[in-house]
Amino acid sequence: MKSSVAQVRGSNYDKVDTRSSSERSSSPEDSNEERSPSPRDRGYSNRSRDYSDRDRYEDRSRSGRYDRSDESRRRERERSTSPRDRGYTDRRRGYSDRDGYGNDRSRNGRYDRSEDNREREKRQNYQDRDYEKRSPPARRRSPPARRSEEQTEEQNQTEPPVKKKKEELDPILTRTGGAYIPPARLRMMQEQITDKSSMAYQRMSWEALKKSINGLVNKVNVSNIGNIIQELLQENIVRGRGLLARSVLQAQSASPIFTHVYAALVSIINSKFPHIGELILKRLILNFRKGYRRNDKQLCLTSSKFVAHLINQNVAHEVLALEMLTLLLERPNDDSVEVAIGFLKESGLKLTQVTPRGINAIFERLRNILHESEIDKRVQYMIEVMFAVRKDGFKDHPVIPEGLDLVEEEDQFTHMLPLEDDYNQEDVLNVFKMDPDFLENEEKYKAIKKEILDEGDSDSEGDANEGSEDESEEEEEDGQEAGTEGEKMTIHDKTEVNLVAFRRTIYLAIQSSLDFEECAHKLIKMDFPESQTKELCNMILDCCAQQRTYEKFFGLLAGRFCLLKKEYLEAFENIFKEQFETIHRLETNKLRNVAKMFAHLLYTDSLPWSVLECMNLSEETTTSSSRIFVKIFFQELCEYMGLPKLNARLKDVTLQPFFQGLLPMDNPKNTRFAINFFTSIGLGGLTDELREHLKNAPKMIMTQKQNVESSDSSSDSSSGSESSSDSDSSSSSSSESSSSSSDSDSSRRKKHSQKKKKSREAHKAASKKQAPDDRRKEAPKHKHQKEKYDDKQSRKSKRDSKN
């Protein structure tokens, strides 16, 4: 078996080896070649050779011999040189003793190695081959030039390692917050710069200005705002107006609770430098529009709150507020309504004072949103709270808080900036820019600063003097008052807190009662003062009016109180008169409930029928609401009592003086109106007497006219007799003086009296010939004609008596 395997391997070797047997020789050198081991046995691994079949190669090297020529042997020797001699360095292979590489070979060219070393190198070769298969094919490179170790060591010693140097940056030119410069070093740097118009000095002054403005704005509050303003004016805020605007807006957005303080600060600066106030307002408007477009509720809330306080300080015009509210409520959602309500709370009182029509339109829009729009419950409650705040007069949201009204009205400057205009927020003012006229501008601002601060000092001194004088005068007046008046001051509470609590207690007692007797018992047990009696009756009536339909519970409760005390009875009588006079203020449902309750009180005789004295049925004295009230009132009475009993009660002789306005008979026009009214509501049976009176009115007028004429004639005759007696007395006195003059006077008087009698008879005859139709037409005006006639007759009688 072994011999066959050896034969197979030998045949394969003959096929692989391209060199023929003719190339081999049997020279003495072949013996040396036989003794020389194969390259594999010498431990070389040349990558240029391909040892594809290592086992067969080993067998050939052991059994077979090479027969090569001189040229082939020379090539073999060149190939068999060490890797180090060929200039290759393989780091994965370890040559522990490179210098002794040549000593390992014996004189006959063989290595003296043990079997273990061969196995170790075999494993190393297999690992190298596997690694080369796994790694990607590398691009072939030419072998590097061979260098000696001495040359490489000398080169390493002559070339030291090169280190990269970091470029040192000027701390002044770094961005904000990038580098901290201690104050001492900053002063030293400023002292070193001699040219104050240079860019470095301007840069340092800009950084100092930025830090100063930012620090002062962050420190401002109600107590120190005056000092902060003076320190701010010490800085060049004209040059740093962009920094000031940015600091104010950032501080306000970070702490919105101090918005009123920042608004007062802006108001003071705006009075001295209006262009700075305009810049801040422009940026605020742009921030609001940006937040509205991005649906950023927080940005809209902060910016709108700042705008509201600037409107209160008269920095911005109220038209801007109306435009913002209109925009927010045009297409309402939860966030926009919330922003609008926050804006209204801050500026509602100012808008109410300045533009009441505009604020009414805004609240009407809010009412429509509350009833029609589908919004969240929380937002609905916010709208209701807003209406309550408006009803209280914005008492928790004053226009300008105490201590911040620091600008005189004549010094205020109001900016008219619409919401929809295009504005430039001038962001270039926020960054440093070299000023070629730096020194001139600094001198100009120093002059402005001196003027402003001098004015402020004079104003403060004047205010201090005036304040000291006022304080001295007040002290003197207080001393005089303390000496003259030793009485204690009484404080009157006009907030009606107790009244609200009392009404709440009554309402809860009414709502928690099962029947009217239990409710009356609870209310009587309450120890409330007598001054609250009318308020109790009003509360019962209000609770009745608030119901959807009339409940008999309230009529029985009111009747029980009317029967208990006379004070309650008088209170309900006064309430009936007040309600009838102001009935036009009630809605139809409330009006119906009130009318039915008072009808119940009259039907049960809890109230006297004398309360109907306030009703006066005529076209001039009634309104649509009062006519509806009377209609429901009498229909309810007719339903309770029936028409016969009601008619009998209205015809009661003892009550007729109280029904003269309800059933008028003084004027046919009013009588006809009352008849038509009761007939239209289905109670025509109550107007029988009125109809008879209207039919008999002409006859009564005729008789009254005749009686008046007879009384006039009797009065004329009595006046004539008086005049004759006067003439007789005068004639008797004149007869004593001269008899001739008395005769002439008596004859004249006789002729005059005869003419007067004839004229009276003719007047009576003419009056009897007048047609009855004319008398009927003149019947309504008879009273006025009678008065005119009496006046004429009295004047004639006086003239006759004089004659």
Curated annotation (Swiss-Prot):
Region feature (Disordered): 1-178, 451-490, 703-803
Keyword Cell inner membrane: no
Domain MIF4G: residue ranges: 210-393
PROSITE patterns listed in its UniProt record: MI
Cross-referenced Pfam families: MA3
Major localization listed first in the record, in broad terms: nucleus
Assembly and binders: Component of the pre-catalytic spliceosome B and the catalytic spliceosome C complexes.
PANTHER family in the cross-refs: CELL CYCLE CONTROL PROTEIN CWF22-RELATED, PRE-MRNA-SPLICING FACTOR CWC22 HOMOLOG
Protein name as it appears in the record: Pre-mRNA-splicing factor CWC22 homolog
